[in-house]
């Protein structure tokens, strides 16, 4: 049986990721318990995937490039860079911590792309067919003008589905322990 070292998610990081989940759902008034649950599940899946070995080894500049794309995808999902910055400020998340989050997302997405199924570079034929289906936020505009945004949206959607699937498959093998600070008098 494989045992991984313990990993910790601090409350303010989880609160930030829950705010992001709420923003992704179009809810601007804070976050709810379901957002915390979704954020925790995504965080766990990304952390597990990011820690797995990728063959052949990924070049550091590719991780950096993918982290930049992860930032862009997240900004688009939450309604822009200012929304992301506001969520980070609300929970005291520094730029360095944001970079760590994007690097974790980058490594997880690279693992999924290289070791599970290609998903970071959809073909133009896939994107065109998706655009014609009318099931995207870009369906009302000409394909050529929305192709880059459609690609980012499609990749983000595929990654979210893959992360959720990975978490659901791993869930029965995980031990999640909630730690809290002792209250006064304990």
For the regions a protein language model found, what residue spans apply to each?
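Amphipathic alpha-helical segments within well-ordered protein domains
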Residues: 50, 85, 112-117, 132, ...
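N-terminal targeting/tethering segments
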Residues: 1-106, 121-129, 145, 161
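A C-terminal, polar beta->alpha supersecondary segment
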Residues: 1-3, 136-186
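Non-catalytic accessory/assembly modules
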Residues: 113-114, 118, 122-133, 166
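Alpha-helix capping at helix-to-loop junctions
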Residues: 80, 104, 112, 116-117, ...
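Short acidic, glycine/proline-enriched loop segments that cap or flank alpha-helices
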Residues: 98-99, 115-119, 138-141
């Amino acid at each position: 049986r494989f045992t991984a070292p313990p990993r910790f998610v601090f409350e303010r990081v989880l609160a930030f990721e829950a705010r992001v989940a709420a923003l992704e759902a179009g809810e601007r008034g804070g976050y709810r318990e379901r957002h915390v649950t979704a954020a925790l599940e995504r965080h766990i899946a990304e952390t597990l995937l990011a820690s797995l070995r990728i063959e052949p080894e990924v070049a550091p500049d590719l991780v950096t490039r993918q982290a930049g794309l992860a930032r862009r995808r997240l900004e688009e999902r939450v309604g822009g860079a200012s929304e992301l910055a506001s969520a980070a400020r609300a929970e005291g998340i520094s730029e360095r911590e944001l970079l760590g989050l994007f690097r974790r997302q980058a490594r997880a997405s690279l693992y999924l792309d290289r070791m599970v199924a290609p998903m970071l570079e959809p073909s133009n034929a896939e994107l065109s067919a998706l655009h014609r289906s009318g099931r995207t936020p870009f369906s009302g505009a000409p394909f050529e003008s929305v192709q880059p945004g459609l690609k980012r949206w499609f990749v983000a959607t595929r990654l979210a589905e893959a992360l959720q699937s990975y978490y659901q498959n791993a869930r029965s093998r995980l031990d999640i322990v909630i730690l809290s600070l002792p209250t006064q008098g304990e």
